[in-house]
Amino acid sequence: MWAHGLARRIGTKVPPAVAHRRRNLLLIHLDGVPKALLDEAIVAGKLPFVSRLIRSGTFQLDDAFWGAPTSTPYFQAGLLYGLRNPNLPAYSWFDRELGRQVRMSTPTDAHVIDERLRGQGRESLLDGGGHGYFSLFRAGAQNALSMSTLASFKQMSRAFSYEMMGLSAGRTRGLWDFLGAFGMDTWRSAREVAHWAHALHDWRHEQSFLVSRVLLQRLGWSFAYTKALVDMVRGVPAVYLVFGNYDEVAHRRGPRSTLALSELYRVDAYLEDLYAMSQSVERPYDVIILSDHGHVDALPLEQRQGRRLESLLLEGAPGELSEDVIRGLRDGRPLQDPVPSAPFAPVIVECGNFAHVYLSGAREPLEARALLARHPEVLARATRSEDIGIVALRRGHSAVAVIRGGVYGPDEVERAPLSPEFSRRAVADFLRGLPAMKTAGDLVVFGEAVRRGGTVGFAWEFGSHGGLTRTEASSLVCWPANAPVDLSGLGHCAQLHDRLAEVYVRQAPRLRWVQ
């Protein structure tokens, strides 16, 4: 078996890991892959290795709901730290505490948020010698290959020799073979980007997408995959490996585009290699495969209306706010008199097929009565737009959704006139969590479902997640049938953390004293 030979070769070049746990864990995160799409690929024979694992009974496959919003920061905070309410409303938002917009693709922002999460006193699945690759948060990992660690050049330079350890010994392809394939991939990617941008007459994001295709999806993934092989030979107790290629392409080309599906199918061979190594090393690994959310087609508002969401909500005639909406938002309480507030230019953060609307710079979000008093015109535009399916906002100590002229709390969502594309479970879960999510907008608007598997999008992209459709809320988890853990029936990513910690961490995560 080739993996045994590779393991012996790597073992002669690298020292064993110092940390040990009762069982070793390899956690493979397929970013953005909904369970339905994986099922289709298995039936179509596009993922032969994964299909064999499941059909043989070696692995179990189940769908999972991780909570809402259906975004990677929220999921990773729950998975790694076990936080049920991490106060992470999207991939990008206006942070009331910092007084500015933050983006998880910005290393300094990711570092600030990681420190904030860590300060809540929970230990991570990666504490005690674990390694993470392409995670947003370092979360206590011994290595430094997450978005948050890129914030420190000094830290990265100190870690350079450690990160390179075993890379040459762990290669599975010859140098010239790799360079030839890399060159061909680069050429094809450049041609595809040029063709796409020319057809759309729009080059937005295309240069960064090309860089992502070449540096992250090819070089970066090859590096992370090789390092995971090396880590297993060394006996690193927990390895968290994020495969982001499908997600990156789905955003720019659509979740069912030929390019996105080819990235999904490509992962099958890597999974086969990783699994082979996991069973060939001295202390075998339990391999768990999961996804964080699904993807839906996004039809950009800018294409549909010729304007951005900011223009739709803040400009033009507001129209009348319906009496039913006013009554539902008041909930028997008297209207407030308009109260002068500090000047604040509204901030609208387009997060894909949903958006956060900030109408105040105060540390506390505006509640329904304050919005009725100060910003009735914005409420009217949002609730009357045919391209906005759900408007979520806080009402008293809870939250409600305005859907087609009606106001519904989390326990009333079942009778709301929602499109069948939306997940009522996800809508209710989001409303229950919104009061504690102080970083979320004063309004959170979700694009209307306009076709099967597709919603209006507010950002300039053609695949979105973070919203509340059934596809976005349907994730997957796949685990060994003989592993001492049951990952079926999970209803939140914090539950996943708890079940994994019970088995794969020396002791359950305990509260740390935070000064």
Which stretches of residues belong to each language-model region?
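A long, amphipathic alpha-helix that forms part
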Residues: R218-L219, D231, V239, Y246-V287, ...
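Active-site neighborhoods of enzymes that stabilize oxyanions during catalysis
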Residues: L98, M104-G140, G328-V514
